[in-house]
């Protein structure tokens, strides 16, 4: 906790400086060198030490150990590749699957040009970009959830 120096408002020199625009930020503790040289390194090293201690004391298990004599029926990729895996799995032609995956970033690159007339940052005033984002989010979640099901139930998520 720092002790802040209180200004003497009866001082004529201070009153002249205040009249010229010297504000409240003039008083207090400066960021250089107090914070940048002493406080920030302590916080950074403390965070690194805490994370290292947690990793040493309670290491997270990556998953079940591999068994070379028992292969699972279907090998799934990591969770963040589920939508891509599902696209390749449900489309009959692999070239079509690759083309669909290439169309996703190309379509996202076109969104600013579609809505170039609208200069607002508020998502409620940009209906096209908001609709594209919501549609993409729903489709990605649907594809990701469907990748965990067998191929015959993957499109309906086992609901129908």
Curated annotation (Swiss-Prot):
**SUPFAM superfamilies reported in the protein's UniProt record:** a domain/subunit of cytochrome bc1 complex (Ubiquinol-cytochrome c reductase)
Return the similarity comment: Belongs to the cytochrome b family. PetD subfamily.
Domain of life of the native organism: Bacteria
Give the protein's recorded name.
Answer: Cytochrome b6-f complex subunit 4
* Family matches, as PROSITE patterns: CYTB_CTER
GO CC aspect terms: plasma membrane-derived thylakoid membrane
Give the bilayer topology.
Answer: Multi-pass membrane protein
What is the taxonomic lineage of the source species?
Answer: Bacteria, Bacillati, Cyanobacteriota, Cyanophyceae, Oscillatoriophycideae
């Amino acid at each position: 906790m720092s002790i802040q120096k209180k200004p003497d408002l009866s001082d004529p020199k201070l009153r002249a400086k205040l009249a010229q625009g010297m504000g409240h930020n003039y008083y207090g503790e400066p960021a250089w060198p107090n914070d940048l040289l002493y406080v920030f390194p302590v916080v950074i090293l403390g965070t690194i030490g805490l994370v290292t201690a947690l990793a040493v004391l309670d290491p997270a298990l990556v998953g079940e150990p591999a068994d070379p004599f028992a292969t699972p029926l279907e090998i799934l990729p990591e969770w963040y590749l589920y939508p891509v895996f599902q696209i390749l799995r449900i489309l009959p032609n692999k070239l079509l699957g690759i083309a669909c995956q290439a169309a996703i970033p190309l379509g996202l690159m076109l969104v600013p040009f579609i809505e170039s007339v609208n200069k607002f940052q508020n998502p409620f005033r940009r209906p096209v970009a908001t609709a594209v984002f919501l549609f993409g989010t729903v489709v990605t979640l649907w594809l990701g959830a469907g990748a965990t099901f067998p191929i015959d139930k993957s499109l309906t998520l086992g609901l129908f």
